[in-house]
Amino acid sequence: MIPLQHGLILAAILFVLGLTGLLIRRNLLFMLISLEVMINAAALAFVVAGSYWGQADGQVMYILAITLAAAEASIGLALLLQLYRRRHTLDIDTVSEMRG
């Protein structure tokens, strides 16, 4: 069994990597992928904590997080596809100059 500290450290490292990718990248697709990494890191923390305390709540929260991530990814990819069809770019600087 993996110690609680090791699992939480791994989850924290994954979360920081996702946050770094979200803040540094200028491509909306890579920003969406970084957000998915952050959601999975939080879900991993739930599973590790639930496993440590012998509760099934961690796995239930993981299933909920996966469902949320799937919905977020499908809506985000649909929006990105439409944005790419209209603007022919996914660069955040170009997209932020859109007129209303």
Swiss-Prot record:
GO terms for molecular function: NADH:ubiquinone reductase (non-electrogenic) activity; quinone binding. It is a multi-pass membrane protein. One of its GO terms (biological process) is ATP synthesis coupled electron transport. It is found in: Cell inner membrane. Its EC number is 7.1.1.-. It catalyses: a quinone + NADH + 5 H(+)(in) = a quinol + NAD(+) + 4 H(+)(out). Keywords: Cell inner membrane, Cell membrane, Membrane, NAD, Quinone, Translocase, Transmembrane, Transmembrane helix, Transport, Ubiquinone. Gene3D superfamilies: 1.10.287.3510. The chain crosses the membrane at residues 4-24, 28-48, 60-80. Pfam families: Oxidored_q2. One of its GO terms (cellular component) is NADH dehydrogenase complex. Its main location: membrane. NDH-1 shuttles electrons from NADH, via FMN and iron-sulfur (Fe-S) centers, to quinones in the respiratory chain. The immediate electron acceptor for the enzyme in this species is believed to be ubiquinone. Couples the redox reaction to proton translocation (for every two electrons transferred, four hydrogen ions are translocated across the cytoplasmic membrane), and thus conserves the redox energy in a proton gradient. Belongs to the complex I subunit 4L family. NDH-1 is composed of 13 different subunits. Subunits NuoA, H, J, K, L, M, N constitute the membrane sector of the complex. This is NADH-quinone oxidoreductase subunit K. It comes from Yersinia pestis. The gene is nuoK.
